[in-house]
Each structure stands twice: as C-alpha cells, then as structure tokens.
Amino acid sequence: ENTMKRLVLLLLNLLMPMILFAASNDLCFRHFSVEDGLSSNSVRALMQDKYGFLWIGTDEGLNRYDGTTVKLYRLKDRGANEAISSLYSTLNKIWIGTDEGIYIYDYETEDIMPFVLATSKNIHIETNTNHIVEDKDKNLWFTTVGQGIFKYNTITNHLEQYEFKNANGLMASVLVDSENQIWAITNWGNSGLFKLNKAENKFETFPLSYESGKHDSNALVMLEDSEHTLWLGTWECGLQKIDKYSGKATTYLHPTDGKGATHIHSIMEYAPHQLLIGSDDGLLLFNTITEEYQLFTEDETNPHSLSNRFVYPIIKDHEGGIWIGTYYGGVNYISPNTGQFESFVHSRFSNSVNGTVIGRFCEDSNGCLLYTSPSPRDT
C-alpha cells in the first residue's frame, strides 16, 4: 500500500505541471507593454527583488513594476541609449548589465551610477554585459561580449579578467552550480563548455561525449536543475542535457528533427522534471522524463495568446507566477492561481515600456522585476 501511495505521489508530481498547461487553447496570457507604462516592448532581462518589485530591463532603460504602476529609471549620462542585458540584486544594490558595461542602482539614494573599477592591468568593463551571477564566496561574475569574463570580489573590491582569447572574448553565460563550481559557455569560434580550475585559477574546456552525431554546443544559456543535471540551450542545436561529472551529453529538441527549438534564450525549472524554455519559436514546456513538450506561441486571432513568439527571459516570482520577456511584445504573465498569462507592451503613452523587444528579465533582492528592450523606433 505504501509503495502504491509513493507511486501515485510520483505520478502526480510529474503530471501536475503538465495539467496546468494542458489546455493550451484555453491559456490566457496577460500582456504588459508600452501601453501599460513600459519604456519598450523589447525585454532582455527580468528580476524580482526582496521587496517584491519586478525589475524589467529593456532596450530603452530600466523599469520597475510595483503591481500597479511602472516607473522608468534612467542611466547617468546615457541619454536614450540604455539597452539593458542583465540584472542581479545583492548587497542592497542592483547590478545592471548594459551594452556599455555595468551600472549600479542604490536603493538608499535611488541613484544609478556606472561601475568604474578597473583590473590590476587597468582594464574596465566597457562592452555588453549579458549575464551576472554570484558565487558562495561573495564574488560577482560578469560575462561580456568581447572582453571575456570578469570576477569581482565584493569583500576585497578586486576585479579580475579571464580573457578567453580563443573565443575572442565573446562569452554567452556563466553558471555557479550547487557545489560552487563555476561554468562558462561561448557560442563563438571554439564553442563549448568551460569549467574553472580553481587551483590554477583558469577556465579549461570541459569535454563532452555525445550519444549521436549532433556534436556542437553553441550554447547561449545554462541551467542546473534540482537533480544537479546541467542543461544547455543552444543557438541551433536544440536543448542539451549534460552530466557534469562524466561529460555525457544528450540532445533534445534539435531543429532538424522537425519538432525542435531554434535559438534558445532561456531555461527555467518550472517544477521537477519540467523545463520552461524561451526560444525564437515561442515558449516550450518540456518534460525531461517523457521527452514530450508543449509549444505556446503568438496567435493573431487570439488576443490572449502569447504576445510575441520571440521569448527571452523567464522567471518565477515569489508567489509562483511566471513572467516572460519577449523581443517585440513586452512582458507576459501567467498567474499561479488562474493559469492565465498577462503581458506588458509598448504604447504612445509616457508611462509605457520603451519598445516591443524584450531581451532579459531579472528579479532583485527587493522582489522587483527588471527587464531590457530596444527603442520602439527600431522595431
């Protein structure tokens, strides 16, 4: 009897996330766009902080949503050129990755100032900073497009650069896993997966062993799930499952299979064995046990469908709601209670998002959601 109960509980654990999304035709996405106050509909980053605010990074600046209204924050001396790629909250500050380096938002003063610290070789972070994470040793890790990876020790105030010359410094993402191991990926040149050798303080290629002939790992994003498996979302090779100890690699959702996903921009563990995947084909819910998936995309005949199929950041808020940033359709939301999506989009009103393209989302320590997007003039 106990064995049967455990089996039933296991089946429910596997099936409940799919049940929520099962009636795809009935899903109602709530949309938030420039018409609702976003500065742009192009969202690159999302984050909720410890206060519950949602911060939204767009190509036209930083937005904060308090559940009712959207507030726009400007970066010092940047004018309208405020494309935001990444957001991270720590030490009562928000670290903002832009196309021209890093800015810092101070909660006490509400000022946003540039991060001007240089390495011992007088190197400043001056290029697109597309990902920010923190390890257990209080180091912040920044991936850049052109300058490799930087490590900032928040205790000693020391900045260090890892150049990745073989990849021309074009890094896609960095991951701190459950064991405080640092991983990095690039999708340029000698694309692949790298692991930090802490003893020698250098990144080394982590060899992968694929089961099939699809061997490229031109990854854009990484995730470690609750079972400590690594997942890579790639540009043109689908979703890849990586055993971080053996290097065994398995490919799923490869575009050439006719049922895959192209240009995966985000991966989030929605529930055990359930991954939400943002891609240029829409939003996918992938079951890692059955290898089945559901695809949600925009439908011009359905005003409550996903606002745009180009899905970038995905986060889960403190209440279990899902926020989705899109490249042209602002922010979409699905409530944990109603199973309905909401969206935020760009409009002619001054309190709307700046554009229709959303690149990334991030939640800060106050519970605020941050996102990035480009100018409506460019969409």
What positions do the PLM features span?
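Carboxylate-rich, polar loop motifs that coordinate divalent cations or form catalytic acidic clusters
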Residues: E1-R377
